[in-house]
């Protein structure tokens, strides 16, 4: 499959999710609207970024909560490729290194990159950045791009190398002191850290909605409903944990 076809597929998913073809997107919010999809945050070690498990009536994405928030967003986009365009019915396990693995995994990484950073929009953004930085992409521009699109340093460097805006040698220098480079430019460091401890085991989406639905219909008792939530690592919904004071503003 060539890059143009992957680009077109990424555009279709943007449209399916109700987004335009150029703006930054919040994939965690958007995927909550996909029928039958549950997303599970779970620590998986350092070599696996995520999994896609497809079923007859529902699907599950498992996202490695030990990876940075920026990488989790990229992984979520990667899993959307497996959900919509991978004809294999089995579970897909996705590796940490972007652009590695079999042909299907490489396509999924390319799809994720195009979904989050649409080619035309990225090209226009790069040109604007280069105009204000002596015609080259420096570390400052890399930090801006990862903050603008809310993805990891590795994902941004991977794409800039593909676009021939960075050499492998220059990119390698930018893999160091990632958090410090962002803080020095005035950015918050949340993007560069794993999920908070209280959210490293957590389920969102279809499973939670379904549990609520069967309770409302009287198909399960309150005790069973709470048991279902606890099995999905949602003690916060059972015991009211981690709920901040509400502010209507």
Describe every region a protein language model picked out.
Residues 1-249:
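Active-site hotspot residues in diverse enzymes, especially metal/ion-binding acidic/histidine motifs
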């Amino acid at each position: 499959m060539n890059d143009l076809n992957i680009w077109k597929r990424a555009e279709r998913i943007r449209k399916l999710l109700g987004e335009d073809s150029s703006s930054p997107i919040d994939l965690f919010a958007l995927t909550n609207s996909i029928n039958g999809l549950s997303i599970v945050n779970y620590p998986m070690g350092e070599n696996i970024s995520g999994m896609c498990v497809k079923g007859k009536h529902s699907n599950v994405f498992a996202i490695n909560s030990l990876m940075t928030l920026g990488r989790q967003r990229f992984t979520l986009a990667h899993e959307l490729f497996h959900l919509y365009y991978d004809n294999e019915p089995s579970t897909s396990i996705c590796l940490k290194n972007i652009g590695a693995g079999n042909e299907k995994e490489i396509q999924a990484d390319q799809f994720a990159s195009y979904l989050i950073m649409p080619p035309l929009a990225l090209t226009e953004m790069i040109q604007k950045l280069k105009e204000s930085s002596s015609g080259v992409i420096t570390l400052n521009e890399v930090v801006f791009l990862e903050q603008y699109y809310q993805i990891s340093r590795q994902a941004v460097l991977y794409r800039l190398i593909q676009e021939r805006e960075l050499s492998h040698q220059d990119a390698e220098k930018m893999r160091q002191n990632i958090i410090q480079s962002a803080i020095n430019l005035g950015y918050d460091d949340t993007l560069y850290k794993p999920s908070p401890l209280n959210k490293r085991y957590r389920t969102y989406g279809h499973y939670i909605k379904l549990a609520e639905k069967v309770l409302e219909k009287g198909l399960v008792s309150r005790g069973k409903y709470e048991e279902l939530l606890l099995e999905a690592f949602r003690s916060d919904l059972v015991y009211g944990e981690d709920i901040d004071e509400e502010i209507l503003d």
